[in-house]
Amino acid sequence: MRKRALIYMIMAGTLALSGCRATSQNTAANASAVEQSAAQDGQNENHDGNGAPDENGAPDGKEAPGGKGGPDGNGVPGAGQSAPESYDAVDEITSDTSESGKTYTSTRTDENAILVSDGATLTLKNFKLNRTSGDSTGGDQSSFYGIGAAILATDGTANLNGGTITTDSKGGAGVFAYGDGTVNISDTTITTKQDTSGGIHVAGGGTLHAENLTVETSGESSAAIRSDRGGGTMTVNGGTYTSNGSGSPAVYCTADITINDATLTATGAEAVCIEGLNSLKLTDCDLSGNIPDNEQNDCDWTVILYQSMSGDSEVGNSTFDMTGGSLTSKNGGMFYTTNTESTFSLNNVKMTYSDSNDFFLKCTGNANKRGWGKSGSNGADCIFTATEQDMKGDIIWDSISTLEFTMKSGSSLTGAIVDDETNAGNGGDGSANVTIDKTSTWTVTGDSRVSKLVCSGTIVDNQGKNVTIKKSDGTVIKKGSSCYTITVDSYSAS
């Protein structure tokens, strides 16, 4: 997989980015620099969406901003899009401004209600903002650069408190930080109604800090917490974030995002989608997802870490870190990683599984119809660490992937560990290494296959019987009375 990363980066670098339109003043310099970086990245924010079967879409398919290609969805979001030379805005803030109790309205096509540029600082308190446009186009220009967002900061700072933001237009993100823009927003309600309209959004290296927001989105490719090409940094403290649209996770992550004490809900998509060299850290959050069945996907998941090769994020290790709080799956399996390097860390999270609970963790190649990597060589390299964590469901791996799975500090797993070569092509030299410390327990529910097993803890079946452990050549290492067998290449008790 690490060798494949170099190949992916070369592939990504070949993506050509062409021009598009422009309308007001400012911000082209930063956009140009970020655009060059994005072109090298070689990804596209398709995660949220319902990507086209033959394109490089995001997992859920529709979150491909205009290009269509989220895990669920319709294709490549942004090949051929370049940064705008200018923006069209009702109010462009180019010097320090402070206002309170005002109402702002925007109705024109693909315009911003408020644009902060030229290093200015805007402070708004107790404000109302309405953006409505039936002719706006949304798509990649909105996802990557913030065209059509209600409030956009490209080179300056927007401090927003006690407001209400409502958008009813394609590409109508609530607030958007791009490039050298920073948004600090608190105690505000954001409602977006159409496609490609995230609640809070960063791209191109922007910075956003949110506190105690109430955010609800309804369109496709409209994650309540959303990022896109060029990434950025986002910190969220408190609040409620709900995504209702198809292909709209609660969190769509192509940035470095930290969320504390928030409620995060996706009613028509996976809970979380992370692509490429990006990270999501959750502490004491309540997170839930409900991905629909989709014939383009070879499985259903609640949290996905992957690489679509669409061009929206840099190839590299995807990181999901969750401590405390709860994670609820309404359909399919829990964690899926494919065509990427990934790191998962779970610490004392309350888990609620779907009725099917297809898997706890799937670390394999894929046969996704949108083409996430080359079939037969698109596995995952995954490090998964569970601390004080109860887990239920099977772990699935294949020979074109590598898995390092560690249980410690009183963790437990109830399930089988299965080598499934369905999407491994001609196979490879992958492995699944499992380490169980002396305080942790694996309750085996089916015959299992592990490359290297290190266990100073407990391994039994669901009746409390010891499980037979044998080598792949048939040599019995530990004879048990259970009907289940764990086959290993190597075994150690410490």
How would you label these PLM feature ranges?
Residues 353, 378, 382, 386-491:
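Extracellular beta-solenoid/beta-roll
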Residues 96-101, 121-127, 158-162, 182-188, ...:
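All-beta strand scaffolds that present successive hydrophobic residues in beta-strands
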Residues 66-83, 129-154, 172-173, 177-179, ...:
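Acidic/polar low-complexity surface segments
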Residues 1-11:
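Positively charged n-region of N-terminal signal peptides that target proteins for export
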Residues 21-85, 370-374:
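Disordered, low-complexity segments in secreted/periplasmic proteins that are enriched in proline
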